[in-house]
Regions:
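Class I S-adenosyl-L-methionine-dependent methyltransferase catalytic core
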Residues: 2-230
């Protein structure tokens, strides 16, 4: 099930919510976006891991955080059809799925250029070693950066921006809000967020958690080191 939430920011915030359990994600997104085009896309897809039953997996039977998508279905999302001639993409990908992330960038019409690393830290500033991983204990996630078109260098702030975010974790899989300040300073709009949680002024947000009243509801929420969205 996908929830359409379209927000128009003028003097107030208005939401249009439509539910349809029969459509594919690609069909749903195409109808939601209509004829709109965007200069910057931010996406945090629900990646499917080989181990879908582990305790940290999104589809863990007891915790059941959220459904995931096959790589081919993520690639099939009609992102390229809704891009301006000059566009940027910021794509979150787990360390173990870097090749898949690069494949999605290409499928959406972008060329990989660089990345931003999110370093998850504790209260005292040290690495939050509660992450998982088969080979190493992961304390980072990757935000891939890709471009489309000509004359697509980042805006002036980007040339001073280091490619690292250091912040504490919040609920499972939620990404740091620091990303928005970086993206809005380095890239131009209109802005589109795919698989977003909650809403943000000045952005078009699509996803089944793109709701003004979004609150995490899984049990692991209370164990994470940071606070939820205010």
């Amino acid at each position: 099930m996908y929830v359409h939430v379209l927000f128009v920011w003028q003097f107030e915030c208005r939401a249009i919510i439509m539910l349809d359990m029969t459509k594919t994600a690609a069909q749903d997104l195409a109808e939601f976006l209509g004829d709109d085009e965007f200069g910057t896309v931010l996406a945090d897809p629900p990646w499917r891991f080989v181990n879908r039953t582990g305790k940290v997996a999104p589809e863990h039977k007891r915790l059941a955080r959220y459904p995931t998508m096959e790589l081919e279905d993520i690639c099939a999302l009609p992102v390229a059809e809704h891009l301006a001639d000059r566009a940027h993409c910021y794509l979150w990908v787990p360390n173990a799925l870097l090749p898949e992330g690069l494949a999605v960038l290409q499928a959406w019409g972008f060329e990989y250029k660089s990345n931003i690393i999110w370093h998850k830290i504790r209260k005292d500033g040290g690495s939050d070693g509660r992450g998982v991983g088969f080979y190493f204990r992961n304390v980072t996630e990757i935000l891939l950066f890709g471009t489309r078109g000509k004359n697509v260098r980042t805006e002036a702030p980007g040339r001073r921006q280091v490619n690292m975010i250091q912040s504490r974790k919040r609920e499972h899989s939620r990404k740091p809000d620091e990303q928005y300040r970086i993206i809005e300073g380095c890239s131009w709009g209109p802005y589109l967020e795919l698989f977003g949680r909650g809403i943000r002024e000045g952005w078009t947000v699509w996803g089944n958690q793109a709701d003004a009243d979004y609150k995490p509801d899984w049990k692991t929420y209370s164990y994470n080191s940071g606070l939820a969205a205010e």
